[in-house]
């Protein structure tokens, strides 16, 4: 099975035929379910909605940004999974930092992160964003964007493939699904 087929298998409904998807239903039998009502908790509903419509803001700084654009192109087409790249931090909930972060760009990264509405998540893409990469010992390079903003998922590679970014997004969706909100 190729990488594209594995990603499609993960993003489509992994439940075997004949079983019901229980994202919004509790375990076991309930008289409410027999009458056609769906019961769930507010946390489960919010996390389900957040994982299905992630809107990343691109923060491309170097060659990793080319692979990030490749992930949004026709071959992988993140749009069909509900992942739509947004141009403004006020419209996005995920930031993808791709490339070498230099000291002059660090305040801009923090300012853009602060403009994003809560809840917000960060994906660090590539060796340079993760820890400085090839330019680690340069005086002008920040040794990892996690020194500036909190990072939720690290995608390794120099540059990482578009499939690796999609896998990182899937891992972020799993992380969002496991989180508890303070709603309700």
Curated annotation (Swiss-Prot):
GO MF annotations in UniProt? 4 iron, 4 sulfur cluster binding; iron ion binding; NADH dehydrogenase (ubiquinone) activity; NADH:ubiquinone reductase (non-electrogenic) activity; quinone binding
Q: Which membrane topology term applies here? A: Peripheral membrane protein
The record ties this protein, via Pfam families, to: Oxidored_q6 (PF01058)
Localization, per the record, is: Cell inner membrane
- Cofactor comment: Binds 1 [4Fe-4S] cluster.
Return the Gene3D superfamilies for the record. 3.40.50.12280
The answer to whether UniProt assigns keyword Aminoacyl-tRNA synthetase to this entry is no
- Class of enzymatic activity (EC top level): translocase
Known EC number:
7.1.1.-
Q: Which residues bind [4Fe-4S] cluster?
A: 63-64, 128, 158
A biological process (GO) of this protein is:
aerobic respiration
Keywords attached to this Swiss-Prot or TrEMBL record, sorted alphabetically, are:
4Fe-4S, Cell inner membrane, Cell membrane, Iron, Iron-sulfur, Membrane, Metal-binding, NAD, Quinone, Translocase, Transport, Ubiquinone
Q: Which InterPro entries match?
A: NADH_UbQ_OxRdtase-like_20kDa, NADH_UQ_OxRdtase_20Kd_su
User: Per the record, what are the reactions this protein catalyses?
Assistant: a quinone + NADH + 5 H(+)(in) = a quinol + NAD(+) + 4 H(+)(out)
What cofactor does this one take?
[4Fe-4S] cluster
Q: Any keyword Translocase?
A: yes
**Cross-referenced NCBIfam families:** nuoB_fam (TIGR01957), PRK06411.1 (NF005012)
Q: Which HAMAP family match?
A: NDH1_NuoB (MF_01356)
Name the UniProt record assigns to this protein: NADH-quinone oxidoreductase subunit B
Q: Which organism is it from?
A: Xylella fastidiosa (strain 9a5c)
Task: Recite the lineage of the species.
Answer: Bacteria, Pseudomonadati, Pseudomonadota, Gammaproteobacteria, Lysobacterales
Q: Which gene encodes it?
A: nuoB
């Amino acid at each position: 099975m190729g990488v594209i087929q594995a990603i499609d298998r993960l993003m489509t409904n992994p439940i075997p035929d004949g079983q019901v998807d229980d994202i919004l239903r509790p375990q076991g039998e309930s008289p409410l379910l027999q009458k056609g009502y769906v019961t769930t908790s507010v946390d489960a509903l919010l996390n389900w909605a957040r994982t299905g419509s992630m809107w990343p803001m691109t923060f491309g700084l170097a060659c990793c940004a080319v692979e990030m654009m490749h992930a949004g192109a026709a071959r992988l087409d993140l749009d069909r999974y509900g992942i739509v790249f947004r141009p403004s931090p006020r419209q996005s909930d995920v930031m993808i930092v791709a490339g070498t972060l230099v000291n002059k760009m660090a305040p801009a990264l923090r300012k853009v992160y602060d403009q994003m509405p809560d809840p917000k998540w960060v994906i660090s893409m590539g060796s340079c964003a993760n820890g400085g990469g090839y330019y680690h010992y340069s005086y002008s390079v920040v040794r990892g964007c996690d020194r500036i903003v909190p990072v939720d998922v690290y995608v390794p590679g120099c540059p990482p493939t578009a499939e690796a970014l999609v896998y990182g997004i899937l891992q972020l969706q799993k992380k969002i699904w496991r989180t508890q909100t303070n709603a309700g």
